[in-house]
């Protein structure tokens, strides 16, 4: 479809549009400026992998999210504020340290050292010199993962960093690094080999020249984790890192190979060192002679389990026998020097890191898979987690309800459904989130037409959970519900990934598809299944073995490989299915699985994970795919398009950074050339079918965007981030209407999307109350300007109904506005939100001007006209009723007319009061100049009567807030109560509303008659 034809369909002036899709360029940032991402939430925590505190400020702490940036609290965890969105270009923060000698200086290391199969890497070290207000990059970007930072207690420019390295492949930027100039330059001072990095690092509490470093040989692939090898070991330096000694073979140490190691020391015993060592015969080891000899103190599995995911130790600075080991079972604590450990509760689960105030050891912070939690009493009580929007979602689905809902599974949380706007309040409160499944991974898909029924995939048995939110019934379905824990993928009847795809057919709602090594289909809502494809993977048995070795086996479905990882169904052709595998294959069937064709793009590297396939909404043979290979140390984006059912593919990555892996690609549902792509660090848009890409980041934090969904009716974009929860971009119509001609015009008005007459408001500060942000309740009007208007050539927006009656006018010149001043008039894209209210074109006293704002209009067709100079542009839009509202058009019309009548009376009262003020002033002057007593007495009586009329019309102003409890309210105030009663709901006004209005109207007429009588006396007296 040509852009010219699409413009006609949308009612846009053809002369202002480019001639063809291909002519759409990369647009300047100002052309997107007025768009804004809206945080939905949840505020229920998320994975935190780095924590620290400020010794001198006991209530100040910092936390680093797994892909959520840096957060700060100054009230011991009651509230958290992000301090890194201003500056950091990555979200994974794995190390934090505050300079002991200057609490304003903070170093942050990026990348995750708790090497989950889904971990996110970083870009080195960042530094703040103003307590987190601003940040600058401080080097080591090639390391990708910084596990620990240690700062010289006397010199904040002297810093050591433990660099784990690439994790997914060998690289030389590993080991321990040192800077003496605050990060301007770095020197590698400990290096083993390209497969081994530094995972922990401590400084002796009594001597900054003494360092202990844990080196870890680690490699991850999509199909395997290898934790440990000959490169792993424990090292010591006694001269600030100039020379190192390998302690791994000292007396009492376990035999190798070693895996991950955690280290701790206490100022209370300067010669004592603790080490938690992953090894055959590993456990907690202690040296009381500076590392010369060692003794194993503890070896039970509650400390040594899943070493790659835990293995940190912390010692109390005041009590060397008091030791902490964050673990899955809780915060493991020893009070006898490591001989025994007991679990202590802390908020959250899967605890990873902690910081203990060295001067007040009862004050501590713990980071875990639920967030950051603080204790000020030694772990007796802990701060809340539900104030941190750090959720890691894998996917997002939307339904067709109003408002539409979002669905997704949160890592280390559960699977949730949430509304995109809360029409009962000012934000999306925590009680708007509803759990629909217990799984922390995978897809959550609502049934078309029955969104109260969801299907969610997850678990280690490839289960599919069906949940009915009406009846609260759940059913666990699946082709082969056998627990796979501890088994290699090669032994399974069905291989499935941790995040296996779940797809409900758009053509047959009870048809469900799953991706295992083959495609599974159920025609009866999951009760029975059949294989509709052969094994579509490469089926390399060497990549289907147990993971975790050579020391600790870790067999979960996270590393299961050779599986179908992406499914897509054509919305245009029943039976046309696409399948992509995690080992780099793409398949197509046009007969619902009877025959499959290998349509793998020739340029797609082997073993790439095909994470998303998008079937076109406009052409059956067109599809896009997004693939990634960052877990093989290849961070390039892989996006492809085919227009002939996969016979030919074109790579489409121009404009994307070459180090941002691609997760998802989606097509707009109305503009065939408009595409969206989610990457490792953000989101991009293409306006020409993928030929060129540009950032659509706007105010979105830099974090991985794992999935994108276009909600057609709302013209909204919903995204799942892997560290900052759900976000929505409301009203993407401006993206559809952008064009060269629109940008070159002096002004260009875009077509407003349908607005909804509903309740609920937007509080821009909702996040302060741990709530998601509502959209503005009104009509969003977008317009482009080449330059800002001035008072000589003001810009105005006028709103009229279908009969041409003016409802409101806003102008950049306040004197020409019937409502508030139009102050959104800058070069580039602007957004104005009309509140859908009638605004009377009257000028009243400031304290009375509020009555000029009338009721919200009724559903119907409206126009907005933009005027500047001699140019006038008009667009038509609709306002629809909330479909949940039972009111009829006649009900809403009756409500509107009543409220307009009340408003008319309120305006009359306001103008009457203004007139009385003028009359008072005149009488006061006459009284001062009157020569006879009789005249002065008459004027005094008139002034008194005017005061009585004023008091009857409106309660006198007072500095006392509760003065209204001491005197009757006026007619104006009582009319306000009726306005509130009739206007708060979108229903037919109650009989009482009408009766009270009529009674008050009659009272006003009585007072008006009294005023007329006084004025007649004054006229006669003259």
Residue ranges and their predicted role:
Residues 7-18:
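Bacterial N-terminal signal peptides
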Residues 23-769, 776-786:
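Beta-propeller blade termini and top-face loops
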Residues 91, 806-853:
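Glycine-centered tight-turn motifs at strand-turn-strand junctions
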Residues 466-467, 781-785, 790-810, 861-865:
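Beta-strand-rich binding/interaction modules
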Residues 734-760, 874-910:
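Low-complexity, Pro/Ser/Thr- and charge-rich linker/hinge segments at domain boundaries
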Residues 758-796, 800, 829-833, 892, ...:
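Contiguous beta-strand segments within globular domains
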Residues 840-844, 867-875:
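Short acidic/polar inter-strand loop motif in beta-rich domains
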Residues 868, 877, 910-1022:
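Mature extracytoplasmic or organellar-lumen-exposed domains after removal of signal/transit peptides
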């Amino acid at each position: 479809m040509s852009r010219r034809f699409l413009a006609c369909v949308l009612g846009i002036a053809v002369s202002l549009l480019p001639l063809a899709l291909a002519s759409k360029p990369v647009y300047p940032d100002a052309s997107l400026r007025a768009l804004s991402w809206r945080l939905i939430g949840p505020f229920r925590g998320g994975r935190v992998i780095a924590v620290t505190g400020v010794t001198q400020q006991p209530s100040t702490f910092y936390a680093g999210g797994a892909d959520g940036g840096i957060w700060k609290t100054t009230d011991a965890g009651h509230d958290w504020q992000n301090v890194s969105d201003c500056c950091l270009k990555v979200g994974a923060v794995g190390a934090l340290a505050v300079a002991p000698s200057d609490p304003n200086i903070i170093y942050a290391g990026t990348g995750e050292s708790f090497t989950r199969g889904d971990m996110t890497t970083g870009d080195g070290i960042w530094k703040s010199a103003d307590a987190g207000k601003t940040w600058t990059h401080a080097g080591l970007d090639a390391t990708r993962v910084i596990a620990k930072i240690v700062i010289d207690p006397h010199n904040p420019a002297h810093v050591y960093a433990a660099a784990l390295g690439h994790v997914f492949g060998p690289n030389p930027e590993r080991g321990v690094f040192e800077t003496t100039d605050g990060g301007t330059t770095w020197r590698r001072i400990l290096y083993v080999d390209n497969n081994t990095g530094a995972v922990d690092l401590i400084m002796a509490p009594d001597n900054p020249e003494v360092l202990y470093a844990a080196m870890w040989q680690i490699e991850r692939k999509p199909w395997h984790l290898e934790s440990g090898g000959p490169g792993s070991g424990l090292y010591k330096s006694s001269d600030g890192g100039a020379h190192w000694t390998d302690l791994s073979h000292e007396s009492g140490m376990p035999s190798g190979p070693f895996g991950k190691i955690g280290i701790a020391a206490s100022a209370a015993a300067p010669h004592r060192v603790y080490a938690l060592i992953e090894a055959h015969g590993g456990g907690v080891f202690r040296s009381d002679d500076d590392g010369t000899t060692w003794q194993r103190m503890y070896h039970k599995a509650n400390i040594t389990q899943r070493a790659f995911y835990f293995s940190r130790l912390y010692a109390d600075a005041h009590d060397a026998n008091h030791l902490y080991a964050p673990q899955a079972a809780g915060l493991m604590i020893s009070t006898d020097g490591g001989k025994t450990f007991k679990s202590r509760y802390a908020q959250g689960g899967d605890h990873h890191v902690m910081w203990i105030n060295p001067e007040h050891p009862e004050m501590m912070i713990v980071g875990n898979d639920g967030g950051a939690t603080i204790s000020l009493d030694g772990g007796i009580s802990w701060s809340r987690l539900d104030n941190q929007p750090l959720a890691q979602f894998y996917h997002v689905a939307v339904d067709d309800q109003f408002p539409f809902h979002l669905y997704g599974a949160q890592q280390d949380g559960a699977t949730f459904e949430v509304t995109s706007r809360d029409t009962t309040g000012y934000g999306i409160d925590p009680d708007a989130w509803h759990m629909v499944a217990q799984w922390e991974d995978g897809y959550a898909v609502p049934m078309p037409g029955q969104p109260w029924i969801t299907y969610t995939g997850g678990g280690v048995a490839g289960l599919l959970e069906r949940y009915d939110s009406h009846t609260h019934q759940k059913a666990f379905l699946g082709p082969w519900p056998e627990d796979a824990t501890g088994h290699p993928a090669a032994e399974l009847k069905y291989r499935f990934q941790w995040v296996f795809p779940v797809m409900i057919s758009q053509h047959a709602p009870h048809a469900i598809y799953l991706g295992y090594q083959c495609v599974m289909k159920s025609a009866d809502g999951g009760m029975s299944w059949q294989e509709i494809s052969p094994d579509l993977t490469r089926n390399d048995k060497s990549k289907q073995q147990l993971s975790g070795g050579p020391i600790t086996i870790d067999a979960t479905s996270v590393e299961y490989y050779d599986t179908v990882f992406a499914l897509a169904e054509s919305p245009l052709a029943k039976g046309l299915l696409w399948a992509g595998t995690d080992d780099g294959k793409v398949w197509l069937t046009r007969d619902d699985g009877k025959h499959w064709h290998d349509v793998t793009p020739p340029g797609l590297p082997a073993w790439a994970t095909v994470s998303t396939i998008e079937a076109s909404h406009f052409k059956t043979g067109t599809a896009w795919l997004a693939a990634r290979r960052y877990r093989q140390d290849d961070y390039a984006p892989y996006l492809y398009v085919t227009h002939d059912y996969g016979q030919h593919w074109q790579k489409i990555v121009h404009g994307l950074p070459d180090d941002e892996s691609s997760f998802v690609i989606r097509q707009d549902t109305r503009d065939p050339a408009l595409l969206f792509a989610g990457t490792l660090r953000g989101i991009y848009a293409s306006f020409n079918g993928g030929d060129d890409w540009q950032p659509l980041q706007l105010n979105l934090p830099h974090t991985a965007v794992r999935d994108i969904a276009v909600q057609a009716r709302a013209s909204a974009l919903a995204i799942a981030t892997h560290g900052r929860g759900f976000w929505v971009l409301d009203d993407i119509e401006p993206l559809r209407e952008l064009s060269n001609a629109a940008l070159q015009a002096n002004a260009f008005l875009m077509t407003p999307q349908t607005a909804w007459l509903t309740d609920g408001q937007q509080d821009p500060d909702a996040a302060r109350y741990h709530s998601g942000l509502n959209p503005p309740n009104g009509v969003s009007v977008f317009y482009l300007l080449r330059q800002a208007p001035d008072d000589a050539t003001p810009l105005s927006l006028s709103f009229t109904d279908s009969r041409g009656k003016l409802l409101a006018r806003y102008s950049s010149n306040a004197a020409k506005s019937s409502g508030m001043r139009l102050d959104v008039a800058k070069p580039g894209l602007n957004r104005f939100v009309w509140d859908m209210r009638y605004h009377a074109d009257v000028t009243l006293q400031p304290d009375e001007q509020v009555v000029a704002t009338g009721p919200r209009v009724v559903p119907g067709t409206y126009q907005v006209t933009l005027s500047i100079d001699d140019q006038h542009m008009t667009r038509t839009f609709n306002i629809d009723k909330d479909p949940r509202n039972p009111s009829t058009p006649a009900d809403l019309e009756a409500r509107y007319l009543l409220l307009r009548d009340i408003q008319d009376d309120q305006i009359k009262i306001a103008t009457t009061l203004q007139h009385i003020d003028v009359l008072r002033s005149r009488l006061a002057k006459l009284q001062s100049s009157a020569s006879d007593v009789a005249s002065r007495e008459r004027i005094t009586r008139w002034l008194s009567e005017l005061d009585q009329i004023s008091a009857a019309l409106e309660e006198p102003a007072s500095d006392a807030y509760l003065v209204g409890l001491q005197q009757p309210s006026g007619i104006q105030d009582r009319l306000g109560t009726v306005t509130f009663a009739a206007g708060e709901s979108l229903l037919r006004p109650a009989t009482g509303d009408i009766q009270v209005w009529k009674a008050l109207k009659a009272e006003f007429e009585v007072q008006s008659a009294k005023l007329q009588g006084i004025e007649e006396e004054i006229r006669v007296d003259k």
